[in-house]
Amino acid sequence: MARRSLPLLKHLLSRRIPARSVTYMHRPGDGSPRPVTLIPGDGIGPMVTGAVEQVMEAMHAPVYFEKFEVHGNMKAVPPEVLDSIRKNKVCLKGGLVTPMGGGVSSLNVQLRKELDLYASLVNCFNLPGLPTRHDNVDIVVIRENTEGEYSGLEHEVVPGVVESLKVITKFCSERIAKYAFEYAYLNNRKKVTAVHKANIMKLADGLFLESCREVATKYPGIKYNEIIVDNCCMQLVSKPEQFDVMVTPNLYGNLVANTAAGIAGGTGVMPGGTVVSYYCIVTSVFSSDYLPF
């Protein structure tokens, strides 16, 4: 992982940072502060990202934030926001609400497609001082983020009949499977579980499973198993400690990650992010629907 990060690290260190007021206090041997794109978002998003800003300031972290006001009711992500993320490589984002009904598409999905953020990673684990029903929970949910039911391919065939397409490709399935197994290998994880519904969606989820199985053969030191998504949810709430790394298609990963986060202490305190080779958008697992009282 260090070798892979070296070109990006050299690129960030070589950037000329314009002079500006920052909260960071230089220390001997430190380089220039790094810019991070900040999207406070909707609902409790500004509260969560604001807390992160306070932590960064208190620890004198070598970063400063380029803040943008983006909200879920906008028609599109502003180009300057995308340019900032491409430039800075790292973005801290609060939740963006997705309005119900037609007219406005999800800005979260737009971000994933524009930047090809194909992997969503959520780490759900017990936190000291936060009592939960289950102990020894340490689950990493890795979700394919660019296709499946979230492809946005919907249309009305005739009045009163809507067709929604689920797209699964071998390329994206293999890509997310490789990411999951590589993550497990690099982080000393012992098992990868593929979540599916191939007993019903035999072609779509069948292709996802076939891709996972092919990738699994290249990692003989990591145990691989499969579980149907409805049984997975039942097992999560009854015996979550049996899971390690979970790899899922898009929709299932959304449900599984939120369930696992709730078991481990709540969606507001579990770290997560969407990543590719060059960009990373870090967020908590909460929904923007959780509004402050």
Regions flagged by a language model, labelled:
Residues 112-126, 218-227, 269-283:
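Short, acidic/small-residue loops that bind anionic groups at enzyme active sites
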Residues 31-35, 61, 86-88, 116-117, ...:
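Short coil/turn connectors at secondary-structure junctions
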Residues 73-166, 251-255:
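N-terminal glycine-rich phosphate/adenylate-binding segment common to multiple enzyme folds
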Residues 31, 37-53, 158-230, 242:
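Glycine-rich phosphate/diphosphate-binding loop of Rossmann-like nucleotide-binding domains
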Residues 42-45, 89, 142, 180, ...:
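Buried hydrophobic positions in well-ordered alpha/beta secondary-structure cores of metabolic enzymes
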Residues 7, 12, 79, 121, ...:
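Glycine-rich phosphate/nucleotide-binding loop
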Residues 1-30:
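N-terminal mitochondrial targeting presequence
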Residues 60-82, 234-236:
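N-terminal beta-loop-helix "entrance" segment that forms/cooperates
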